Amino acid sequence: MEHLKATGLDKLIKDLKQPVLGICLGMQLMCKHSEEGNADCLGIFDAEVKRFVPKRHEDKVPHMGWNTITNTNSALFTGFDKDEFVYFVHSYYVPVNEHTAATTDYIHPFSAALHKDNFYATQFHPEKSGSVGERILKNFLDL
């Protein structure tokens, strides 16, 4: 975030009118604030980024692996079937909120994707999610 602010990109990004896609850390930077480094972020999404806190011995952080996503409510997921898997690798998450466009569950439910106006974001990595991720990226390019 410091580099974005130092170069003026923080203001430029918020003013963009074309579709914008943030992936993983990109989604987190689009939120209001992050527990990682106690950083104020872009504030595109009125949401906080929180660190996963394991509840059981088998809960590992970072969360790395394949999860299904549900409640897909965005043009990114056009043609998306239920129970398709996408790949995650992250230690921080965004709680479900008014901008949530898809959810998943690891330790507890969280936002797998966000959408507001021309801004789209995924916590998972579509570029690592095989044909499902390819479809999501194609849907974004078709916006």
Give each language-model segment a name:
Residues M1-H63:
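Cysteine-nucleophile active-site neighborhood
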Residues E2, L12-D15, E48-L143:
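Amide-donor transfer/coupling interface in amidating biosynthetic enzymes
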